[in-house]
C-alpha cells in the first residue's frame, strides 16, 4: 500500500530544490482555453516559487482565466486526457513549502479573476436574514474588508496578514486571534462554489453536497478549487483598544491566556487574543522601535529579559473592539480584565487605533521589511498545534532548549485555541486536547547559511516533539513521507482517501502538497 502511494518529494539543494517537469499534451494548445495559457519563461518563472523561497518547481504553463468556467475546462481536459497533468490554483503564492506549485503542469493564476467586476457582493441581511458576503476565491481579505465596511459589516475571524486570498486561507483553515471565540475562518463559511478534480462546477453547503463542502474547507486544495465563498458577517466596530502585556514567567503567561479564552472570561473580555515570544538577544540586537513599541518600551523590555534566568519573555496581545457609543466604558472594561491577570508589574502597553489599522497591522511591518530588503527572503516557517497539556514541556524543550543561544529574525507566536470551535466534519486537523496552542515559528533567512541552520532547528523541534510524545500537529503542513501524512490526518486518513477518489481520482489538484502521487482511480481504491 505504501509503495503504491509513494511520493516524489522535492530534494533540498542549497536554498532551493528544483523539480524537473515533463510536457503537456499537445492538443491542449488547440483547446478553447489555449488563448489564456502562457508559456513564456518570465510567466512560468513567477509561478515557480512561493513566499517560502525554499522550493522551486516550474510549471509548463500558467492559465490566466477570465471566468471560473475556464478553470473547469482546463481541469476537465486534464482529467479526460490519457496523461493527466497537475493543476494548482495560485493566489498570492503565500505558501512556504511549494504547496502552490505545479511541476510539469499548469498553475492557475487565480488573481486574474479579480479583473472582473462584481466578484465581491455584500448582503446586509434584515427581515430575519443574517448578513453575508459572497467573495471570489481570488479576492484578497483586504479587499473583502473594504467592501464589507461600506455596509458597516465585517467577517468575524481574520488572519494576521490580509494580503492573501480567500480561497488560500479557507483551503487551510484561516486562524487568528478571534478564532478562540468564533472558530477558524472555515467555521464561518456558509456556502462555496467549487471546481472538483473531475472539472465539475458545484455549489455546496452544510445541507447541499455536504461531503464536498466539508472536504474542501481545510482540505489543502486536494478535493476542489474554491472560486466563491459565502462568509457570515457581523457589525463592524470603529475602534480598537490594542494591548500587549509582558511576562517573564511562562506558567503565569499560559495560565492568563487560558483564562482569557475561557467562556467565563471571554464573554466580557478581549475580542482578540494572541501571544508572542521574544528569545534571548532579539530585543537588544533587533530594531530599536517597531510599529507598536517605542524605543523606550524596547529598552524597558530588554531590561526585563536580562533579569530573567532564561532571557525569554512572553507577550499576551489582546484587543477590545468599541464604537463611539461605548468609548466611555472601554477603559473600565479593560481595567476589569487586567485586574484578573498577573503580567509583570508595570509592563502593560496600550494603543488606540481604528479597526482597519488593527486588522491591517502587518502591512506596516511588511513595508518596513521591504524597505530594507528583508521581505523577499527565504521563510523556513514551521507552524504547530501543541496540546495544552504539553505546552510547558514544549517551552522547556524548544524555546529554552533547541533555541538556546539563537537570535532569530522573525516572529514566534504562541497562543491557545478552543477545540470545540472546530468542526470535525471538515478535513482540517486541529489539536488533540480540548484546548491547544498555536505555535508559529515564523523565522526568516537573511544571511548565507541561514536556511540550512533554520531547517536543522526545525527538524530538531519536530524530533523533540516526536521523541517526547508531545502530540503536535502541523498547521500549513509539510511532510516528507506518506506515513507522515497518515499520522497527520490520524483517524481522518481513510476518509481523506475516500474523498480523493470521489473528487480528484487522478490526483490532478494541488500536487505541491505531496500528499498523493498522480494516481488512477483503481490505484486509489486499492490503498
UniProtKB/Swiss-Prot annotation:
Residues bearing attached sugar chains per UniProt: 121, 280, 323
First and last residue of the signal peptide: 1-22
Single GO MF annotation: cytokinin dehydrogenase activity
Cofactor or coenzyme needed: FAD
Modification type Pros-8alpha-FAD histidine: residues: 94
InterPro entries reported in the protein's UniProt record: Cytok_DH_C_sf, Cytokinin_DH_FAD/cytokin-bd, FAD-bd_PCMH, FAD-bd_PCMH-like_sf, FAD-bd_PCMH_sub1, FAD-bd_PCMH_sub2, FAD-linked_Oxase-like_C, FAD-linked_Oxidoreductases_BP
Enzyme Commission number, as recorded: 1.5.99.12
Residue ranges of every copy of the FAD-binding PCMH-type domain listed in the record: 55-236
A single cellular component GO annotation: extracellular region
Binding residues annotated for FAD, in chain numbering: 91, 93, 95, 99, 160, 165, 171, 175, 226, 475, 510, 513
Catalysis: reaction(s): N(6)-dimethylallyladenine + A + H2O = 3-methyl-2-butenal + adenine + AH2
Keywords, sorted A to Z: FAD, Flavoprotein, Glycoprotein, Oxidoreductase, Secreted, Signal
Major enzyme class: oxidoreductase
Cell compartments where the protein resides: Secreted, Extracellular space
Biological processes, Gene Ontology terms: cytokinin metabolic process
Subunit (UniProt): Monomer.
Functional description taken from the UniProt entry: Catalyzes the oxidation of cytokinins, a family of N(6)-substituted adenine derivatives that are plant hormones, where the substituent is an isopentenyl group.
The family this protein is said to belong to: Belongs to the oxygen-dependent FAD-linked oxidoreductase family.
Name this polypeptide is given: Cytokinin dehydrogenase 6
Amino acid at each position: 500500500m505504501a509503495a503504491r502511494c509513494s511520493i516524489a518529494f522535492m530534494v533540498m539543494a542549497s536554498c532551493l530544490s528544483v523539480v524537473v517537469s515533463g510536457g503537456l499534451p499537445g492538443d491542449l494548445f488547440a483547446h478553447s482555453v489555449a488563448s489564456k495559457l502562457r508559456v513564456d519563461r518570465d510567466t512560468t518563472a513567477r509561478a515557480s516559487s512561493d513566499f517560502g523561497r525554499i522550493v522551486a518547481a516550474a510549471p509548463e504553463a500558467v492559465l490566466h482565466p477570465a471566468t471560473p468556467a475556464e478553470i473547469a475546462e482546463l481541469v476537465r481536459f486534464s482529467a479526460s486526457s490519457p496523461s493527466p497533468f497537475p493543476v494548482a490554483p495560485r493566489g498570492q503564492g503565500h505558501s512556504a513549502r511549494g504547496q502552490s506549485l505545479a511541476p510539469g503542469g499548469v498553475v492557475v493564476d487565480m488573481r486574474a479573476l479579480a479583473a472582473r467586476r462584481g466578484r465581491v457582493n455584500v448582503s446586509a441581511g434584515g427581515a430575519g436574514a443574517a448578513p453575508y458576503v459572497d467573495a471570489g476565491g481570488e479576492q484578497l481579505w483586504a479587499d473583502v474588508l473594504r467592501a464589507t465596511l461600506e455596509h458597516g459589516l465585517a467577517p468575524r475571524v481574520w488572519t494576521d496578514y490580509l494580503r492573501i486570498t480567500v480561497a488560500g486561507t479557507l483551503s487551510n483553515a484561516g486562524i487568528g486571534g478571534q478564532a478562540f471565540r468564533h472558530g477558524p475562518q472555515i467555521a464561518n463559511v456558509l456556502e462555496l462554489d467549487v471546481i472538483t478534480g473531475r472539472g465539475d462546477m458545484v455549489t455546496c453547503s452544510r445541507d447541499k453536497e455536504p461531503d464536498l463542502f466539508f472536504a474542501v474547507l481545510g482540505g489543502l486544495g486536494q478535493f476542489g478549487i474554491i472560486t466563491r465563498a459565502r462568509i457570515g458577517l457581523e457589525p463592524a466596530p470603529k475602534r480598537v483598544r490594542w494591548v500587549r502585556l509582558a511576562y517573564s514567567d511562562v506558567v503565569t503567561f499560559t495560565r492568563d491566556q487560558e483564562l482569557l479564552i475561557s467562556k467565563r472570561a471571554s464573554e466580557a473580555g478581549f475580542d482578540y487574543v494572541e501571544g508572542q515570544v521574544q528569545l534571548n538577544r532579539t530585543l537588544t540586537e533587533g530594531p530599536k522601535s517597531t510599529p507598536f513599541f517605542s524605543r523606550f518600551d524596547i529598552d524597558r523590555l530588554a531590561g526585563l529579559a536580562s533579569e530573567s534566568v532564561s532571557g525569554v519573555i512572553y507577550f499576551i496581545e489582546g484587543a477590545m473592539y468599541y464604537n463611539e457609543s461605548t468609548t466611555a466604558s472601554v477603559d473600565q472594561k479593560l481595567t476589569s480584565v487586567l485586574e484578573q491577570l498577573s503580567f509583570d508589574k508595570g509592563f502593560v502597553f496600550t494603543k488606540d487605533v481604528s479597526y482597519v489599522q488593527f486588522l491591517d497591522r502587518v502591512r506596516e511591518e511588511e513595508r518596513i521589511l521591504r524597505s530594507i530588503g528583508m521581505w523577499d527572503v527565504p521563510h523556513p516557517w514551521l507552524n504547530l498545534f501543541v496540546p495544552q497539556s504539553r505546552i510547558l514541556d514544549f517551552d522547556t524543550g524548544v524555546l529554552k532548549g533547541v533555541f538556546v543561544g539563537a537570535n532569530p529574525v522573525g516572529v514566534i507566536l504562541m497562543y491557545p485555541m478552543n477545540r470545540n470551535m472546530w468542526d470535525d466534519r471538515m478535513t482540517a486537523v486541529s489539536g488533540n486536547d480540548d484546548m491547544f496552542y498555536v505555535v508559529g515559528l515564523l523565522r526568516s533567512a537573511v544571511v548565507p547559511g541561514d536556511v540550512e541552520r533554520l531547517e536543522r532547528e526545525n527538524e530538531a523541534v519536530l524530533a523533540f516533539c516526536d521523541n517526547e510524545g508531545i502530540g503536535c500537529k502541523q498547521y500549513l503542513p509539510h511532510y516528507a513521507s506518506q506515513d507522515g501524512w497518515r499520522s497527520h490526518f490520524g483517524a481522518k486518513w481513510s476518509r481523506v482517501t475516500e474523498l480523493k477518489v470521489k473528487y480528484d481520482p487522478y490526483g490532478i489538484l494541488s500536487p505541491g502538497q505531496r500528499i498523493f502521487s498522480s494516481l488512477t482511480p483503481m490505484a486509489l481504491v486499492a490503498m
